[in-house]
Amino acid sequence: MNTNSLSRLWIMMRREVWESPFSFKWTPVIVVGFILLFTILALIIGARVDNEMVFTKDGIRQFAEMAVEQRSLLLYGVTISISAIFTQVMFVVVVFYLAGCLYDDRRDRSILFWKSLPISDTMTVASKILTAIVLAPLVYLAGTILIQILIMLIATCYSFLAGVNPFTTFWGPSNLPSMWLLLLFGGLVQGLWLLPLYAWILFCSSWAPRLPILIAVLVPVLIGIFQQFWSFFSDFRFSTENIMLTILERIGRGVVPATIEWDQITDGSERLTRPAEEMFMSYGSVVDSLFSLQMWIGIAIGIVFIVASIWFRKRATDS
């Protein structure tokens, strides 16, 4: 792929964002607003209960007296939890975006206009799947960074009231720039992890006569139910290798930016021995996930669905 093709692909990805402003622009803003609103409401309620903020100030002072490692761990957990909210909202948004992106072109016949342009169907489908696994994580990461900075500014104001240094208490231990780079890397890897699910939904959008999201959900559900019935009536036991369990496991690992590495932080009794930031996410866990067999099997399945989507896209106007 030459530079001209990459430039055209980038323009088409930006077009996807421009045509879906609620999904990729307003939804992150709304999530930021809700988190900020609930944070402010919690502080207001706390101020009404805690007259003159005696307990609040004492709590901040006690937090400042903790070891740096403890403060770093607590702040890391809070910021990762915030990013998890954005990741989960993004997953829902991307699912509905992919379910409608090719189907809507066929429904309103705008596909005729796009096919009249010097843009291949391969490029069109690629722009949509790349928007889901690359551009969407970048947009929602921007929302994550914004709300984290706003909450840290609120914490800074409270630390001044408590008479502690906000930079050594909050900003330093939080190590935000390093965490943002990790979230960026992890978000892109999670996008690849979810590629088979995203590609399946895109595939349904390319051929479904109506309600592609319903078809995308019902087909694996029915297969999973059939698997359970078949295994039960043939072996009188429920199957452990169920397609629905596999999908739910992949979704669970793809929408939560956290990986608890028990082999690194626990002893043989599963008792927490060395709690650290690796409880939530680390470069090691992300790299291990990237080069795992499950990841590459999923990518191969996703490529098959993408190729099938291109095939149906090319024949969408034949009838």
Report the location of each language-model feature:
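Hydrophobic alpha-helical transmembrane segments
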Residues: 1-100, 105, 141, 193-195, ...
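Helix-loop-helix units of permease transmembrane domains in multi-pass membrane transporters
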Residues: 101-131, 313
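Juxtamembrane inter-helical linkers in multi-pass membrane proteins
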Residues: 3, 112-120, 161-173
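Hydrophobic core positions of alpha-helical segments in small-molecule transporters
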Residues: 26, 127, 216-219, 293
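Transmembrane helix segments
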Residues: 40-41, 179-180, 208-261
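Secretory targeting signals
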Residues: 39, 43, 62, 70-96, ...
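Hydrophobic alpha-helical segments of integral membrane proteins
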Residues: 9, 13-20, 110, 129, ...
